[in-house]
Amino acid sequence: MNNRVEMRTIDPNIRNKNFEEVSLGYSNEEALLEASRCLNCKAKPCVKGCPVNIDIPGFISKIKENNINEAYNIISKSSLLPAICGRVCPQENQCEKYCVRGVKSLPVAIGRLERYVADNNTCTTKFDIIKNNIKVAVIGSGPAGLSCASELAIMGYDVCVFEGRGCEGICGRI
C-alpha cells in the first residue's frame, strides 16, 4: 500500500528508433492501486500546492470508485488541460510536494493519475459560446497561455495565440 506504482515505459531499444511517448500511462489496475494510496486528508495540503486548485482528493476518490468521467468533471472545473498538465506540470514541486504520504514514503502520483483520467474519460464537454466580436492576443503557447486562450474563447472572445520560440503562432480559431 505504501509503494508508489511506477509508470510503465517503452523499452529503450524500441524508443530510440521512434518519437512515440516514452511513458505508457497507467492501466486501470495500476491507477486503482495508486489511487488507493491517497489518504483523503481533510486539510487537503495537495490542493494548496496546486496552482489551479484542482480538488485532488475528490478526483482520486472517483478513480477509487472507478468513475473516470466524474473524476474528469472534477478536474475540468479547475483545468481545461488535464491531458497536458498530467504530463508536463512539475507536480513534484507543487501538489505532490505537499502530499502527506510523502512524509514517510513517496507521495501519491497525482500527475500520473490526472493523466490517466484525461486519457481514459469518455465524456465530452460542450460549451454554449456567445461570440462578443472582441479580438484578444495571448502571448505564449505553454499551459498557462493555452488555458488562458481556452477560457477567453469560452467567454466568446476571438483568440489568437502567439509563440516566440520558433513557431508562427496558433492563429487559428480557438
Say what each PLM segment does.
Residues 94, 147, 170:
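Conserved SAM/SAH-binding loop-helix junction
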Residues 157-171:
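Glycine-rich FAD pyrophosphate-binding loop
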Residues 110, 150, 171-174:
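Short acidic, glycine/serine/threonine-rich loops at helix termini
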Residues 134-160:
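N-terminal Rossmann-like FAD-binding beta1-loop-alpha1 element of flavoenzymes
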